[in-house]
Structure formats: C-alpha cells, structure tokens
Amino acid sequence: GNVQHKFLVMHFTAGSSAQESVEWLASPKAKASAHVVIGRDGSITQLVPFDRVAWHAGASSWEGYEGLNQYSLGIELDNAGKLTRQGDRWLAWFGTEYDNSDVIEAVHKFETQPAGWEVYTPEKIDSALKVAGLLIDEYGLGEVIGHEDIAPHRKCDPGPAFPMSSFRARLMGRAEDQATVYETTTDLNIRSGP
C-alpha cells in the first residue's frame, strides 16, 4: 500500500555490514524491509520506493497512530547496536569484536544497566542528515523518531550512541537557522532626576 507520510523512523540494522543488511532486507525470508540502508562509509541504498509501505516498524504506536509502517518512512543505519563486554572486549551478538574507540558505554533510556553501543560514524550521520532532510522536504514529515520511541521496551534502536537530539534539531529546526536580526535605535530620551 501507499504510505501516509507523517514520520521518519530511525533504526540500526544490528548487523555486521550494510551489504549483509541490504541482502537480508531484500529477501522474502526477512519479513521486514526499510526504505533506505546507510552504510558505515555513508553509502546509501534505497530498497523500497518512498511512496510505498516498508515493513520496518512492526507493532508500534505514536501520538495516536497504530502500526507506524503505514505512516512512516524508515532509515536503517548500519550499526551493530548493543554490545556485550567480555573482559576488555566488546562483542556483537553475531560474534564481531569492536575496539573500545568504536564503542560508548551508556544506559539505554528504557534500561537500568549500562551496555556497550557501537558509535555512529560521521559519514553515516552526514548521509542520514542529507537523506532525512530531502525526505522531510519532499514528503512534509512532521517528526523524526527512533524505533525505540514507537516500540518501547521491545526495540532499542537507534540507541544511546545515536545523537537524536542534535539530529532532530538540525533537521526540524532548519527554518530557524537564520540569525535573528535585532534593530537598535539611538533615539532614546533618557533623563535623570525629577
């Protein structure tokens, strides 16, 4: 069916590479899809036309809307997501080890214990900003949200390593980026005394 464009939903793939995620999401076995996958290097792959429903949100709700697939576009960011500490190493669920410099330790907003989270590369964030900005402009999307926001306690993406606040501000506040112009006057009539 056709999407009723209202929201942009940000995800992480929880996979080992963008190519693997693209291949998986393009497979009927996946029973899931997304409009776009963005790689660690900033590469962009479109999987589903932007006017068609993609199966990225699952059981979800937001601001009175149920089943967000019908109302949103989905961007998947190539990212391992939540990592597990084993000694001095960080491991993804699929076995890949991540260097400490590629991981932040943080508590997810719906959890109480810290975990490791793969950081998002600047290239990935830049590409996501470009794609998201174009989609917001073209389809009039009113809000950028995380999968974790529309499916709390079921999903944890894009997670605490994703700079959602600044990402949203850069996208949704673009019209307000122009500096405010203040005019001052020198025609003040200031008196002292009675």
Residue ranges, per PLM feature:
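Acidic/histidine-rich, metal-coordinating catalytic segments
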Residues: 138-154
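Short, small-residue-rich loop/turn micro-motifs
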Residues: 77-79, 148, 186-188
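Short, surface-exposed, charged/polar-biased interaction segments
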Residues: 31, 65-68, 149, 156, ...
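SH3/SH3-like (including bacterial SH3b) beta-barrel domains
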Residues: 192-194
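Histidine-centered divalent-metal-coordination microenvironment in nucleic-acid enzymes
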Residues: 72-76, 151, 159-161
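Short, low-complexity, polybasic intrinsically disordered segments
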Residues: 153-177
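Active-site-adjacent loop/helix surface patches within enzyme catalytic domains
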Residues: 1-142
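SH3-family beta-barrel domains
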Residues: 173-189
